[in-house]
């Protein structure tokens, strides 16, 4: 039918489908090139270091605008806000928004790289930040949590929250039907009552409103380069690859076979929690109880350690 090129546009699921299509066409000796364009606000496709997926920067920009407004509300009202951001397995969006807004606590899946993720650990991180700010004489704050943490929680762990979920055909809780921010806010409020700590918190969900915002200049230029890059790679005969564009605008192929497992599933790019950037954000911006705070924290917590 004279089809020469299949262009797929999307995130890791679409990229995985593109990989399997490429494998199928190669097995059938079908001469159709396939080039994938990395588009997702989750920023979790395994592009070279420092290269975002297109759409991420625009979503982050809108998220920062909303998160800054929320933080100002917290300051003027003396309250806390528990914010949740999209992210699936990776915490790029929550990390990018939280770091840009100087949030005192950013909770992403990658920070649990040496321990199991549990609801209890997340609640303790939030309470720790609240108490630390009280010690510092600051009566407000905000925490942002990546919804990706739910990806690593067992069904039992989720059900033990006491939240009433609907269930899919396989008996799994349907997380898409509930606000993650509301879940954590309810659980934190219950714990604060148990601890007799007076803190008011409110939930804010940063969800679908980030997905279709007007693209910022970075993404307009970046997407243009990726589109032109597809044509360049097509003319050069490349197939079964993703188009990439580095910070100076040079386009190159990233072969899908190099970033997919044996089943053709493209592996997500997670936040590099061991990077200097992550270390500086968590060491410089995050506020939580440390050993030198134990005595002061004992006014609020029986066992601050």
Predicted regions: what they are:
Residues 156-305:
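C-terminal non-catalytic interaction/assembly regions of soluble proteins
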Residues 12-14, 39-43, 87-88, 112, ...:
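Acidic, glycine-rich active-site loops and adjacent beta-strand->loop/helix elements
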Residues 11, 55, 108-109, 118, ...:
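Alpha-helix initiation/capping motif
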Residues 1-6:
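Alpha/propeptide regions of enzymes that mature by internal proteolysis
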Residues 38, 98, 230:
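Residue-level signature of catalytic and energy-coupling elements of molecular machines
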């Amino acid at each position: 039918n004279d089809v020469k090129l299949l262009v797929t546009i999307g995130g890791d699921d679409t990229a995985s489908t593109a990989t399997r299509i490429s494998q199928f066409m190669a097995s059938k000796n079908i001469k159709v090139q396939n080039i994938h364009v990395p588009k997702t606000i989750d920023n979790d496709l395994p592009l070279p270091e420092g290269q975002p997926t297109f759409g991420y920067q625009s979503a982050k920009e809108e998220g920062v605008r909303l998160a800054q407004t929320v933080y100002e509300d917290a300051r003027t009202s003396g309250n806390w806000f528990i914010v949740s951001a999209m992210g699936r397995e990776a915490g790029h969006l929550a990390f990018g928004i939280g770091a840009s807004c100087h949030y005192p606590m950013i909770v992403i899946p990658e920070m649990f790289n040496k321990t199991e993720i549990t609801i209890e650990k997340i609640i303790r991180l939030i309470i720790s930040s609240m108490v630390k700010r009280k010690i510092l004489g600051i009566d407000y704050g905000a925490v942002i949590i990546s919804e990706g943490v739910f990806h690593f929680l067992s069904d039992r762990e989720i059900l033990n929250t006491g939240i009433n979920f609907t269930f899919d055909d396989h008996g799994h809780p349907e997380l898409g039907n509930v606000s993650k921010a509301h879940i954590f806010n309810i659980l934190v409020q219950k714990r604060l009552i148990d601890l007799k700590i007076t803190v008011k918190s409110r939930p804010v969900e940063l969800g679908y409103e980030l997905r279709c915002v007007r693209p910022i200049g970075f993404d307009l230029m970046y997407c243009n380069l990726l589109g032109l890059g597809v044509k360049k790679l097509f003319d050069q005969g490349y197939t079964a690859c993703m188009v990439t564009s580095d910070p100076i605008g040079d386009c190159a192929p990233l072969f899908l076979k190099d970033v997919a497992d044996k089943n053709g599933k493209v592996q997500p790019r997670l936040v590099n929690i061991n990077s200097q950037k992550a270390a500086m954000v968590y060491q410089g911006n995050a506020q939580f109880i440390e050993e030198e705070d134990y005595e002061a924290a004992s006014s609020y917590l029986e066992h601050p350690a």
